[in-house]
Amino acid sequence: MIKSNYTTALAAGLVSVVSIGAALPSSAQHGPRDYQRTALTAMKEGKWQEALDAVDRCIRVYEPRIKTLGLDDGFGWFYYQKGVCLAQLKQYKEAVEAFKACYTKFPSAKNQLVKMALFREGENYCRLGDFAKGAELLEKFLKEYRSDPVARNVNAGEVQGLLAQCYFKMDPPAFEKGLENLTSCVTSRYKGRRITDAVITNGFRAMVDAAIKTGKCQETVKFVEAHPSVMNISPTRVALYAPRLV
């Protein structure tokens, strides 16, 4: 099991997509739909392994017969939920592969979760510590999400906060790109967008660490002067990290 030092605050997005069902024909009612119901019930109860088992069985049994059964790209739902379950079980490498399969094998609009799969793939690359790949996919998501009826509900400001973490945590840190995204994230909050404390706090913590590594402490001080409210975010007080800049 891989322990991740990457913090996401978009888990709430799971709630909005769990209720989206795969587009399955009536002829598949007693096949994939049964697995779907089992998986959804287990997920809502937090039984991630049980849900994963149901989704995996459906993929093994029905994916080889997608065309003959009249199934379409809506079957990507099962790969997406497989990725969700694996991520909840902290099996991030396997989650990446599941989300990648959802995005690449079922790319049409009939797969309602195709763009969300792109986001989740990037998110889980970050959890693996591959911040460059994670940032690449999150940037791609921001270019594509507005045209998608599901993904466009994601808060772009929070994605930029996560992108900031990626850039700051790269080796070496891409400090300017991190600063650009964290600034956009904080600005979105000033404009009234709901940006969670966790996103800004963890972005700022990553910024402090990157500033120390790159000698960019003065730039960080200027950021705080321009956005003083970030020093008083609860529950984690970012001010605790200010002495590290001195």
How does the language model describe each region?
Residues 24-77:
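N-terminal leader/linker segments that initiate helical-solenoid repeat arrays
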Residues 33, 70-73, 77, 116, ...:
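Residue register of alpha-helical TPR repeats
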Residues 36, 80, 119, 161, ...:
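TPR/TPR-like alpha-solenoid signature
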Residues 46, 90, 129, 171-173, ...:
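Residue-level detector of the short coil/turn that links helix A to helix B
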Residues 61-73, 104-112, 144-154, 188-197, ...:
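Flexible helix-coil transition and linker loops at the boundaries of alpha-helical arrays
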